Amino acid sequence: MATSRAALCAVAVVCVVLAAACAPARAIHVGTPAAALFEEFKRTYGRAYETLAEEQQRLANFERNLELMREHQARNPHAQFGITKFFDLSEAEFAARYLNGAAYFAAAKRHAAQHYRKARADLSAVPDAVDWREKGAVTPVKDQGACGSCWAFSAVGNIEGQWYLAGHELVSLSEQQLVSCDDMNDGCDGGLMLQAFDWLLQNTNGHLHTEDSYPYVSGNGYVPECSNSSELVVGAQIDGHVLIGSSEKAMAAWLAKNGPIAIALDASSFMSYKSGVLTACIGKQLNHGVLLVGYDMTGEVPYWVIKNSWGGDWGEQGYVRVVMGVNACLLSEYPVSAHVRESAAPGTSTSSETPAPRPVMVEQVICFDKNCTQGCRKTLIKANECHKNGGGGASMIKCSPQKVTMCTYSNEFCVGGGLCFETPDGKCAPYFLGSIMNTCHYT
């Protein structure tokens, strides 16, 4: 692979020249608004710089990012911007880590349009709103760290959703397998989602390992050798991929029927994003891979819901909303998806197999005594769906072999770290001062 080739999210070596200093770093420009905010930023994110020169450079970066933040806020009345964990990075550092590779990606987009199968979508009946988080098809937000691996997170997030919607349990899959093993892409130096799908099909028979068996370790920018451990577990299998029509109506129709879509966009407006809907998103070049998980056209400002890979402490618990209908951030330029054969166990054929049963409802019995016999209340709950609670929280209940997992969340989308509790399927278990029995019912 040519070393000079650029790629989506490519990470260049950025040299920030800082003057040497023997004295330890100390607070500078105390009393100015920017300096006060900078001190708060350092406390919040645990920053400590080795020299006074480096601290001065980081403060200068911080001040410049404050200016950019205010510019974005002035252009986006439906969104809120603020100080994020990226604010001590220079524009060059941030772009090199997260926003590089436009020229290569443009060429790759043209190649995809010519050589990949195009999906068709029924445009006659597009729902007003869809959110695949609420239907259990999206894993928790992840963090690529200081590695240009957004392409892997976008591709893996798409496969996770397609695997679930083909009739399987939602499972978190391995980005590290792609970052370390996929030689059609460039690991932390960038890549493309369609090429990730191609590599899986050509080299692993479409198999992707679980995150538990092959966890992500490249958040510091280091890419270890590809693992061939006998302890790796196959979590999903794809059998193809499609290029989705690059109109937003076609994307909405396909997403509503088929699930989350891997897309590329211009993330130049994302550094200081906190919440709300971006209506004036920069759209100059594709530079970042993300996952489109839903949309809502019922309000004053219609918007897309996008899962990012910058951690749950960025944006709306790791998500961003972007206005629909104007190709904001160039988000309709490169929508793609893997394809999963319905109800196939990893590495098997469905030609003569009965589809695996899928949990539909959980019968939950909560009782006052310890044996699930007295003062009991029975409730039927839809499995694998996000259920909003009062006060802005939500809960989800999931079935897996021999156990049931109940999770509560502080947000309405069942994303991020939840408080989870497991019980055996169909068996009584202690629950607070009484007992509980969860029984999964399948189709």
From Swiss-Prot:
It holds the Pfam family Inhibitor_I29. Residues 28-125 form a propeptide. The active site is at C150, H288, N308. Glycans are attached at N228. GO terms for molecular function: cysteine-type endopeptidase activity. Residues 1-27 form the signal peptide. PROSITE patterns: THIOL_PROTEASE_ASN, THIOL_PROTEASE_CYS, THIOL_PROTEASE_HIS. GO terms for biological process: proteolysis. Disulfide bonds join C147-C188, C181-C226, C281-C329. It is an enzyme of class 3 (hydrolase). Its EC number is 3.4.22.-. Keywords: Disulfide bond, Glycoprotein, Hydrolase, Protease, Signal, Thiol protease, Zymogen. Belongs to the peptidase C1 family. This is Cysteine proteinase B. It comes from Leishmania mexicana. The gene is LMCPB.
